[in-house]
Amino acid sequence: MHNKKVTKDEKKNTKTKDVNEHIPNYIKNLPWYYQDIDKNSKNNSKEQDYLRHHRQRRDDKTIDIDNNDQAKIGTGIKDEFEVIVENKKTTIDGIIKRRKDEKDWDARKDRWYGYSGKEYEEVLKKWEKSREDLNNTTEESAYDTDEEIEMMKLGLTPKDLEQNIKGSSVRLREDKAAYLKDIYSSTTNYDPKSRLYKSDDLGSIDEHSNMFLRHLTGEGKELNDLNKFARENAKESGIRDELVDADKVNHVLVANPTKLEVLRKQKELDSLKLTEEQNRQEQRKLKRKAKLLKKKAKKPKGTPQSDSTKAQLMDMYG
């Protein structure tokens, strides 16, 4: 290790004590807020400790370090208080007086401590008022508006409620449960787990999986139709599942949903145009046939010849 150079100030301040050269500068040097105090201090003697800013107990009281080990005397209760009135400090003489509490510890720990009898009297008055209001109410106003509306819908009156007359059953006797249809049938169409009765209106049984599948409706049906169109379009373009093809990505529904949807709409429009054109051509053919039929020779119309006239003509012209 290289020996550190000692400054001139350190040599002056350390005539009697040797300076430890191994102490770093950030420990040895005084901070900026201590240097001003050191210059103004009266005990700025020649023989000063260069590590005095680290000492807890010193002879000179230039630097005050907070030491919690030593006992301290508090300032005590002040009789004068500073009050700011219109941006000016003024002192007010005052004496802090403690309130005399006549109640002892047992009184303060009592369960009814701080509770007055006047509050309970007010509660009793409220209860009496509520009882009087209930007694003064008539039978018509006893029911709430929501209850009255519900009773009107059910066709009931307050007298019916008193007599406990039950309304007619909402469900008819002819309305039987769906699972009762399987009692005398060989096949079970009711699934108790899904609570679904298998019928042709709701769905059909798949031949491959032998499972009952519901008929798709709404967006599910549209997505299924679009998936079928994507598969057919891929087959038309020569793409197969067993072969590896880079163009296969362009015909996948998940990768190109909007593209295939637009393509399907375009093909539907083209098919509509073709059907319209075919219908027009058929109408033209029918019109041509009608014109040709009008131009053909018509059978003569007149009175038929009698047998005598026919015989005379045969004799004359052979």
Curated annotation (Swiss-Prot):
Disordered as annotated region, ranges: 1-22, 37-62, 274-318
Top-rank taxon, per record: Eukaryota
Stretches with biased composition (Basic residues): 285-301
Cell location: Nucleus
Keyword annotations of the record: mRNA processing, mRNA splicing, Nucleus, Spliceosome
Pfam families according to UniProt: Slu7
GO cellular-component term (any): Prp19 complex
Function, as annotated: Involved in pre-mRNA splicing.
Full protein name: Pre-mRNA-splicing factor SLU7
Species this protein is from: Candida glabrata (strain ATCC 2001 / BCRC 20586 / JCM 3761 / NBRC 0622 / NRRL Y-65 / CBS 138)
